[in-house]
Amino acid sequence: MKHKLISAKVIADSISPEGVRMTTMEIEYPRFILAELNTHRMLSKNSASSRAIPVKAMHDFIRANPATPVHWGKNQPGMKAKEELTGPESKNAVFIWNQAKEDALHWADALAHKLAVHKQIANRITEPWMTMKTVISGTEWTNFFHLRNHPDAQPEIKALAEAMTVAYTTHLPVQLKPGEWHLPYITTATYVPTGELQYFDENFNRLDVEDAKIISASCCAQVSYRKNDPTFEKAFRLWEQLIENDPVHASPIEHQATPMDISSMCRFEPETWQPGVTHVSANSDLWSGNLRGWIQHRKLIQNEAVW
């Protein structure tokens, strides 16, 4: 079932010569299910941030797009509400939910504009009514779909998983070779005479692969404040702030990846592994961070994590 504030679209979809699919989606959903989404650690995520979006902008967005439950379940023992409120009870529940939203907006505004409290605090009051935008990438989707597209899941995350399942199963991935990059928010095309994969910005200006990776990372990072400026200038400013700074904030570079050159490596001889390969699993698959069969951009960056 479709819901107004819950959506999913594929923005990059690739498959390696070994048949491992790497998919990136842009999803929208109520913030109150973010914790459930974040339990799926095999998927990389960047999301809109209460710390990054100004209070007034956040309040304007909440008033235009308030998050609401998709199923007003009656109270009962356990985690699943099977019976739904109807008639006056349902209308009253919606009224109380919306009144609580107005109260929260009032007090958050008082903190921010009367006491000059920072947005990272003031925005917390209104989080139940926020909708989230997230960029999510990975090679391991089966368990997410199995758990969340299920009758026992909370209705809102079930609706999200349904939308994501449809997006995933109806989209065809593009075949990539080692050295060719999966890059969200970057347009790609194969130059037929040479077979070379080429990269382009939103104005179809050609990019070299390193610039394309930086712009892709910038666009993934900008989800934090619900904007998308794909220009060189913005990309390189953000790259300096996030990647060339200390500490490195590397989550936006988890969405870019290239297929592993499996034929060049011996799985149980780490000295033969490509840069970026991090481990081998018990079933002999090679991994780069949370990506199977793909080299994750993050794992090619010095000091991407402190151990």
Language-model region placement:
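A conserved ligand/cofactor-binding region detector
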Residues: 1-307
